[in-house]
Amino acid sequence: MRKGPTWFNVTALALGLAFLYVPIAILVVYSFNASRLVTVWGGWSMRWYVELLHDAAMLESALVTLRIGLLSAAAATVLGTLAALALVRFGRFRGRILFGGMIYAPLVMPEVITGLSLLLLFVAVDVDRGFWTITVAHTTLTLCFVAIVVQARLADFDRSLEEAAMDLGCPPLKTFLTVTLPLIAPAIASGFVLAFTLSLDDLILASFTTGPGATTLPIRIYSEVRLGVKPEINAVCTILIAVVAAGLVVASLMSKLSGARGESAPIGTQA
């Protein structure tokens, strides 16, 4: 007989959630504070969000972050999908363990180590650090997350759908484009959104690989906070939290859609 949650478990859960989310809630609330003093409540106001629109440096950093996020997410989606296809479809090829380890290494490797390694690489090949080096760094970081999402979908994929298409004379490439790709498209889109949100709030890798004219939004926020917390920082952080949360919700919905398609496809085939 299953026991219900004890008071200790409920208390521990409540304290854990409070420890994680109360500071975020305070930041969001104080982003609407009318007072310039961040510790003194002066009433509700959208003043600091309006002032963000006139902060040229912050807007430039936001644009740089958006461009890097879109490019790195697109590159990570393509490379991660190809890596997932190789790991699932090619079986136990020679070097599979090494290949998989290299793909998933950023999951377990501290970002400081990854950032330092990339910095040494860029210095060794004499590449000017800036927009493109950050893009490469973020692609390296997010590729593994895309590979995990797509690989999980491919592992549950019904290969008989592809076999039926090829039995009807459909060539392999057309089979992939018309049968496989539409069914794994939600997983690919979910991986793209996840990679984009991870790129948006990365600070460590960007700090190692940034250069002149490539100040991302997290770096800009960090440099501003070192001089003291301002109400504008609360506002821009609230916007970042909202964007990342929305991205994670979209990724979760797409992942569920991918699973639902995978479950319904065999039924349609049998019919």
Please tell me what each predicted stretch does.
Residues V22-R36, V64, G115-D126, V193-L198, ...:
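A structural signal for multi-pass alpha-helical bundles of membrane permease subunits
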Residues V22-A56, S207-P212:
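Short membrane-interfacial helix/loop motifs at transmembrane-helix boundaries
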Residues R2-A12, L85-L87, G91-G95, Q151-E162, ...:
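C-terminal transmembrane helix and the adjacent membrane-cytosol boundary/short C-terminal tail
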